[in-house]
Amino acid sequence: MRAIVATVLLAVCLGAAVLAGAQAPTLAPNELGRVMILEYHKIDNPEARWTRTPENFKRDLTRLWERGYRTVALTDYLDGKISLPAGTSPVILTFDDSSPGQFRYLQKGADWVIDPACGVGILEAFAREHPGFGHAATFYVLPGAKAPNDLFNQADLAGRKLQYLASQGYEIGNHTLWHAELARYPEATVRDQLATAQAWVQRHVPGYRFRTVALPHGSYPKELGWAVSGEAKGMTYKHDAILMVAGGAAPSPHAKNFDPLHLPRIQVVDKDFDYWLTYFDRNPGERYVSDGDPTTVTVASGTTGKVGAVKAARVIERR
């Protein structure tokens, strides 16, 4: 039985979160608040329904930084292990479809270098310039898709890219073999799509196991269990979370209503992204804010009844 400790916590200050003189907001901890899981597709020109320009992607990161958001790994969120400085908030970046602008190499003499205008290049440069922001992200790849979505559209470099992502702390997720809408297919096809996608990635990154799947077009199979775990052609798969294509901000992993098999996301188009940034600006009490201590879960007064199963040693009620 967890101990619920009532205490008074002082408001915390984000002293290190300063960008060009802009001070991040000072927020009291609330680890039952909601979390934005952002969904990107193409990073390219021009801006369109499923395309974010490199300039707008940089602007997105800046707006998040200025508001005290910091990137966290999706699996850390799932495990309830969000370790951030007090007063900051987690944001989760996801990229669907392994399109070229997400991760591109350029040849420089005899070497290959990451294109500074691609998603990975932009994110890593921003993280270097803003210590503490991080570069955590999950890439939902399509190993068997046709060009240009066949593992970022540089066939000879596909293995190098996947190995780089895995070695640098990024996560690789299942998006089926070639973007199959799973509701349309029988069990055998669903399982083959999910297992074979993992097998293809393991050709380049031996032993790599997907922990999450993002459903193409948010299309669930006829039976939920088919997407959770199974086997095909000798390859087993097991997903701890299923990500939807839309739905808004996600619950805290510590909340009773946390459902990892139905995780909503926010599509990053101006309308949706602006809405949620503004929503949490106006309703800061609904936003997940870290207490700075990964061994505790701090919640607002009167909300301990909304806490679900937590792995932390203590739940602290802020008065």
Language model segments and positions:
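Alpha-helical scaffold elements lining the catalytic groove of polysaccharide deacetylases
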Residues: 112, 151-171, 177-205, 225
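Short, well-structured secondary-structure segments
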Residues: 36-39, 69-75, 92, 118-155, ...
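C-terminal region of N-terminal signal peptides and the immediate post-cleavage residues
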Residues: 16-24
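N-terminal export and membrane-targeting signals
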Residues: 1-7
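Alpha-helical scaffolding within the catalytic cores
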Residues: 24-26, 77-83, 121-127, 149-167, ...
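C-terminal active-site subregion of NodB/CE4 polysaccharide deacetylases
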Residues: 23-94, 99-107, 184-319
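Aromatic- and glycine-enriched glycan-recognition loops and surfaces
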Residues: 52-66, 71, 111-124, 152-159
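Bacterial N-terminal signal peptides
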Residues: 7-17
